[in-house]
């Protein structure tokens, strides 16, 4: 059913040197809260920032457009997630 589809959330991890610009744009354009995680590359040990955001399935295409507008080579990892807790309720679809 369409309502089931709209309610499905996706967790997205994004790795890019342009993490500041991307995270600000995701907040402004998608209206979603963004978390910056601190990571380390296993091979070289380089410190890296990872953007973590939860969006609906219907927002994935827009998210990719925003990210690739800043960094075409950004690593984007997407997976299904069940979300509970304050601030992660259903969002109106326009």
Predicted regions mapped to residue ranges:
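Positively charged, small/polar-rich N-terminal and surface patches that mediate targeting and assembly
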Residues: 1-94
